[in-house]
Amino acid sequence: MAEKNKARCAVKRLLFSTSPWLAARLGIKFEMSTADRHFLEDQLFSYINEQCGHEGNILFIGIDRYNWHYPRLIQGKFHSIDLNPRNKRYGNGKTHTTGSATELTRYYPNNRFDVVIANGLIGFGIDTLEDFGALLYGCHAILKTQGLLI
């Protein structure tokens, strides 16, 4: 069973490396099967889609292989930011920014987003009180007045 899963994952990675567009069309996912990810993908994304529809501007902070399918789960305009330049391939190429979560106001104007999703950053890049404060300050600045921070 483990060998079959490894082989399946290797095929998905190869397909993605060859053609991210085709991998997206085929619905390829590299998901993490954890309770928090299921809650985010099922409950929170459904709520965001109900509230924002296709017109909402959503920023996802920290994009990688395991959440590469998120732009396909969000109805609104999906934006992503990640510090690692290699992770650009996992975001929407047109709306991805390579940059720091502690410098959001450097990349985005005030009152830009309906939703900012900053899930799983503490201890994985946001490691100090100063970084946490900068993240919150930036999120507050770029969120619309009635915006939602997750």
Model-predicted segments: where are they?
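Conserved SAM-binding loop of SAM-dependent methyltransferases across substrates and taxa
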Residues: G62-G76
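Helix-to-beta-strand junctions that scaffold the AdoMet/dcAdoMet cofactor pocket
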Residues: G53, G125-I126, L143-T145
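Conserved class I S-adenosyl-L-methionine
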Residues: G53-R65
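A short acidic, Gly/Pro-enriched loop at the edge of an enzyme's catalytic core
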Residues: T102-I117
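Class I SAM-dependent methyltransferase Rossmann-like catalytic core
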Residues: A2-G53
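A short SAM/SAH-binding and catalytic strip from SAM-dependent methyltransferases
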Residues: D114-L129
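S-adenosyl-L-methionine
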Residues: K88-T105
